Curated annotation (Swiss-Prot):
<protein>
    <recommendedName>
        <fullName>Neutrophil antibiotic peptide NP-3B</fullName>
    </recommendedName>
</protein>
<feature type="disulfide bond">
    <location>
        <begin position="66"/>
        <end position="86"/>
    </location>
</feature>
<dbReference type="GO" id="GO:0050829">
    <property type="term" value="P:defense response to Gram-negative bacterium"/>
</dbReference>
<dbReference type="Pfam" id="PF00879">
    <property type="entry name" value="Defensin_propep"/>
</dbReference>
<feature type="propeptide">
    <location>
        <begin position="20"/>
        <end position="58"/>
    </location>
</feature>
<dbReference type="InterPro" id="IPR002366">
    <property type="entry name" value="Alpha-defensin_N"/>
</dbReference>
<dbReference type="GO" id="GO:0071222">
    <property type="term" value="P:cellular response to lipopolysaccharide"/>
</dbReference>
<dbReference type="GO" id="GO:0050830">
    <property type="term" value="P:defense response to Gram-positive bacterium"/>
</dbReference>
<feature type="disulfide bond">
    <location>
        <begin position="61"/>
        <end position="76"/>
    </location>
</feature>
<keyword id="KW-0044">Antibiotic</keyword>
<dbReference type="GO" id="GO:0050832">
    <property type="term" value="P:defense response to fungus"/>
</dbReference>
<dbReference type="GO" id="GO:0005615">
    <property type="term" value="C:extracellular space"/>
</dbReference>
<keyword id="KW-0295">Fungicide</keyword>
<dbReference type="InterPro" id="IPR006080">
    <property type="entry name" value="Beta/alpha-defensin_C"/>
</dbReference>
<dbReference type="InterPro" id="IPR006081">
    <property type="entry name" value="Alpha-defensin_C"/>
</dbReference>
<comment type="function">
    <text>Active in vitro against S.aureus, fungi, Gram-positive and Gram-negative bacteria and to a lesser extent against an enveloped virus.</text>
</comment>
<dbReference type="GO" id="GO:0061844">
    <property type="term" value="P:antimicrobial humoral immune response mediated by antimicrobial peptide"/>
</dbReference>
Length: 87
C-alpha cells in the first residue's frame, strides 16, 4: 500500500513538473481533446480497466486542469508529451 502511494505521489509530482515547464509552440489548440488509448499494466491494471469499463467511466487526456465532475486519474502520453488523465 505504501509503495502504491509513493508511486502515485511521484507520478503526480512528475505531471505537475511537466505542466509547469515552458512549452514550445504546438500545432494543436491547448484545450483540444484527443482520442487516446489508455493501458494499465499488470494484473491489477486489468482489474482497474475492467472496473472502469463496467462503471461507464469516460477519460480524457487534457492539457489543462480537469473539468467539473472529473478528477485526475493519472497521466497519459500523446505524441511524446505527458498530459493529465481526467476521468
Amino acid at each position: 500500500m505504501r509503495t502504491l502511494i509513493l508511486l502515485t505521489t511521484l507520478l503526480l509530482l512528475a505531471l505537475h513538473t511537466q505542466a509547469e515547464s515552458p512549452q514550445g509552440s504546438t500545432k494543436e489548440a491547448p484545450d483540444e481533446e484527443q482520442d487516446i488509448s489508455v493501458f494499465f499494466g499488470g494484473d491489477k491494471g486489468t482489474a482497474l480497466q475492467d472496473a472502469a469499463v463496467k462503471a461507464g467511466v469516460t477519460c480524457s487526456c487534457r492539457t489543462s486542469s480537469c473539468r467539473f465532475g472529473e478528477r485526475l486519474s493519472g497521466a497519459c502520453r500523446l505524441n511524446g508529451r505527458i498530459y493529465r488523465l481526467c476521468c
